[in-house]
């Protein structure tokens, strides 16, 4: 046989021989195989010969090859040489696979039979090529044959088919009708006698792959599931009743693949069986070709498949959907491998660009991912699920950014579902999600942008907060795209609501500064829609940080603030203006409109019936003479009175006469004007009771004052509880400052409200005082015109910054004669403004024509510790002479103060400008009798340092400590006690402010009291207080916690500057070296830049002072300063760069004066920067 095998191989390789010769040699060796054993040396030759025969293109030759191959395999199994079959199977399977897809059915059947013969010896290779390659391939003939082979092997050889069910089910939706028909027959055969669990798996698989309902119903009917949907359409002609594929098959005769091949029992029992797979892919592989007409029914299949999916016993009910009105049917996974298989199957569909061929598959896979998200995968198999999501995130956003609306919407819904269900588990991918969604929100397509907006809201509301999220939102708030800014207002509110119970996460890392910047820009945006949307976010911010909200509110203009306060989101808005129309009015909106129209008609009707009036009589009546009843005045908006830019009163415009205002025609037409124009000198003798009500209504025509601003209407020294006596004294001083400073817009409003709220009693009280002092009346009359100019400009504030000890010395050295011409002018101003005071006691006791003594402090009684007095609620009992001295000293101090010193920054709160300096200049401290004893005071001070370190020291305790220091001075301390107190103050100054202490006062006030106490110790205890390096470091460290626009920053800068200027020359070099080292080691972040900015400002001032005096610092200090300037001139912060330029200018002047080398040493000090930086420095030096 070896010789025949060798001859056969040579014949088959010879292309010159006829086919009949080759066939005859092949049949000859076939006869020998059937009758004799095959020797081992001939096995290889026969396998190679059969391979050449089967691959031949001649039908006679490959038919003889298939026939010979079958007998050859039987002989090898009989000889117990299955291992040889297994070894050669892997080489023969590719050849057989090609024949499995042949266009001739007979050839396909022969190839299938050879696979059946090979299976007992090489089951793994055979199943791989037939059921994993051919069944999922592109050749419909190979698919059809593979399905028939699977049915045969399952029925006759016990092949476990569970792992191949997804591939079979995918063939139910194949583009080829023969494949679909064969797949239905195969499914029916496989599951006809299957257990209930297997049928449930089949139901789930068909639902997962969206098999059309007609096919599903046909399968259910044939496998014994009687509860299939009755709504399916009738069976068509192309869908006959299905019978097993071995019984009948249309359009072809039975093939050899359907012949039952009986193997010997020993061979079958010894054949290795392949274990079944547990994992079942839930999505079919990408089809080759879409079935015609199936695209329009994709959604219909999903909806129709839902009732069938509900039959599965383990299926959960669907959750409510986020936006599309109906949640997708949950898809449950049995194992983690199923989840991995799903992501492996869908990945190829998202490769490359979107096209007409792949967009439907992308949409289907996105829907499958949504169903999987609503299933058990995120909870039972989170690791493979979220890993797969992260891996395919790029493909998901290809769907999100698609131009097809349905695909983009489904992608956004998937992101929303992931955010809601995944929560913090999608944190690793939230950066990519935010970048893509924000880009989507800025697009021109409204539907996609709105979907992106909702998706961003869901992501922000469910993922873990990070500062990067806030940066994304605030960046969108400042974007050029108006639509993005509009959406960002809602995102900001969502973020604030989510973090409302975790404010510290926003407060750290500069989050509050970003929030304030975004809110300010949004509230003043040019787009009204953005302003309206940002108001809701502002009031959410205001509820979390009231003090910062008030700062933002105070910086807005009147119109913006008015609209902001009237916003429905304002929890503290005044409901009085809405009481009549919203709360007390029960009828509907239409009834309200009718009532308003009727009221207007009633108002205008009498004007038509009025007879003509002579010109000598008044033709209209001023509205100031009458006032409507309170119920009416609160229910309608006050009409804006006619006015001009001048504050002088003018005749109101003509208005129709009302029936209830009829009066004699001989009435004085100028009476109202007299009342309105009456000054502090002229008082109408005829009282008008209704005038009081009208004065109370006057403010309704102006802008309503801000409700949350911590700026009082009177000059209360302590913002917590101003006393009556303080109000009287500070109001007198306020009038003196009316010519000194420029009032702010808020002061105008409060002054107008104060002025209009005065009643006639103040004028009556003034007439009594004038009777007692006739010479005062003359002075008042001489200044009548001036009063007309300044009456409306009475300021609400006065600066005490410059009333320091220098002014006190000037006042104490001045002579004390009677009133002269200078006093008359001051008294004239006071007498003009006296009627604006409401307190009768203050006016009764004020005697300004008896100045006798000027040796006391002008601000002696103006202490911010008035709150500690026991008689704070009673009128002042001081003798008239003492009040005279205070008034005269205030006038003299105000007039002797230079104009530059009188200027006050309007952006600061009203009490911040004199809180510290007024205490330093105040010599008269009222302390309790217990504290007047030195031993008792020492005991109090001894524990002060420890209490400050433990943060149990409130604002009132600081003020009490300052009173003790001022009263007792250095006698209060020993060196250990003083050092302990100083250490406690410096520790508190370095500590980061804690928001939980705000109920005791704003933490800026605490730091302010610490700074004030330090400056008081410096002035009161000069022998104990030493300005050392720790104090400088602490005051610069405190600067890190406050924004540049905070008023405490000025106090910190002024304190540090005074310490350096008052430092001994021997220690100045060391302190400058400490300052420079502090700047070098400070971190270059937002808090660090604040300290650096203050240090650079201080260095600039100190070098500037030295330049004016012609002095200079050592070369080492100048080199360090040059290093700092060169480093920070390119800093990220704009203020730092600006201040570095100023420092370079001063350093250039000092180096030029020191070295006399025309700037050569300066460029050496700043490390000789090149390019634009050098030109910039040279420009500012030249401009200087």
Swiss-Prot record:
Function noted in UniProt: Microtubule binding protein that promotes the stabilization of dynamic microtubules. Required for mitotic spindle formation.
Biased composition (Low complexity): 640-649
Signal sequence bounds: none
Region (Disordered): 229-336, 564-584, 602-906
An individual GO BP term: mitotic spindle assembly
Organism of provenance: Aspergillus oryzae (strain ATCC 42149 / RIB 40)
Quaternary structure (record): Interacts with microtubules.
Pfam families in UniProt: CLASP_N
Name of the protein: Protein stu1
PANTHER family membership: CLASP (PTHR21567), CLIP-ASSOCIATING PROTEIN (PTHR21567:SF9)
Residue stretches of biased makeup (Basic and acidic residues): 229-240, 308-317, 787-811, 882-895
GO cellular component, one term: mitotic spindle midzone
Molecular function as annotated in GO: microtubule binding
Nucleus found in the keyword field: yes
Ranges of Polar residues composition bias in the record: 572-584, 723-737
